[in-house]
Amino acid sequence: MTARTQYSARNLLASARSGHADWAPAWTDAEPKARYDAVIVGGGGHGLATAYYLAKNHGVANIAVLEAGWIGGGNTGRNTTIVRSNYLYPESARLYEHSLRLYEGLSKELNFNIMLSQRGVLTLAHSRHDMDAQSRWANAMRCNGIDAELLDARQVRELEPRLNFGGPAQPARYPILGGFIQRRGGSARHDAVAWGYARAASALGVDIVQNCEVTGFTTSQGRVTGVDVRHQGRVGHIQADKVALAVAGYSSVLAAKAGLSLPVTSYALQAMVTEPVKPVLNTVTMSPALGAYWSQSDKGEVVIGGALDHFPSYAQRGNFDVMQQVLAATCEMLPSLGRLRLLRQWAGIVDVVHDSSPIIGPTPVPGLYLNCGWGTGGFKAIPVGGWTLAHALATGRAHELAEPFQLERFHTGRLIDEAGAAGIAH
């Protein structure tokens, strides 16, 4: 275990005397050892959270997180930063609500400001069918003990007056009849979440190894016993009692190297941001019918997200067809943004399974564990993904929250078809 500097206003002011030149690195960039009790492949939010909770909650000290690039450089740094727990089925609701509750205390626990902004997640309804579906959705959330509030058109207008409600002379193409809001939902800074977990895990003795690509697995009598790696141009091998995969869209590729075929398809999910403007959005606003959603960053950029590109891909870039669809929806719903310029556009590779629910826990290959299948919901699930995978690594059994999300459900048929409540893309 390594000591870390306590972040506080007092220390911030004290460090100002030296021009902030005396801060220690947030985490140690380690060299890999020959053997670990647990190796976690993937240095994004889920991998780092798993390492942190495995060390903190279960006392496992000899852990490595192996990242092919840099910490948080994959999907964790490519999402639209939304956190919410507005899911329909009880199994999903319990899982994501636990994650949101962990988020609510994460800045204090990690001693790192994740910039959580619980501004509310507003979902729009454009038809009577939408209103009926959202009434069912919100009622299910309340039955599961999660906050949800149905809104009429007047209440939506009070929350987001810049939405296009139309008028007698020019009715809106997509009329807004109402919607519902989860007021505890909102956004968090993605880089801060990754860095906070990395810093806290490193302080507990976890080795964080960047630029270390896992190229294969070693096995003995059918059991995974380690990983083959390429670290800064050097080829090597690391032994491990247990290996966990937390690599999002690359899960099926790596699992195949261990002889495991996963029901996972990878797609590009793109997003974009505009130039910064004064505050124009008060909430995270979603329109499932239009396949688009919007929020505003602390810097004033309008963050725009949309649907998947439904051609399987591992390319971290989008395409003009999806961009055109999302931007057309944006101009229709928020016409005041129509003359803004885009600053940048990007894509992450998401791992989608048939029932739009994750896979967490042990696999048929002894010694190999999974955290994948989150699809477009990976960022909001970082704390609970790490919490439940750490439990599985420490005990060999699935956490009670993760029991419905085992790989075997695709054999038993006990699927959790969350597509109706998973937001926009799936």
Predicted region positions:
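Active-site substrate-recognition segment that forms the wall
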Residues: 52-56, 81-83, 112-120, 218-224, ...
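Short beta-strand to alpha-helix junction loop
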Residues: 94-97, 124-133, 180-200, 209, ...
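Glycine-rich FAD pyrophosphate-binding loop
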Residues: 55-76
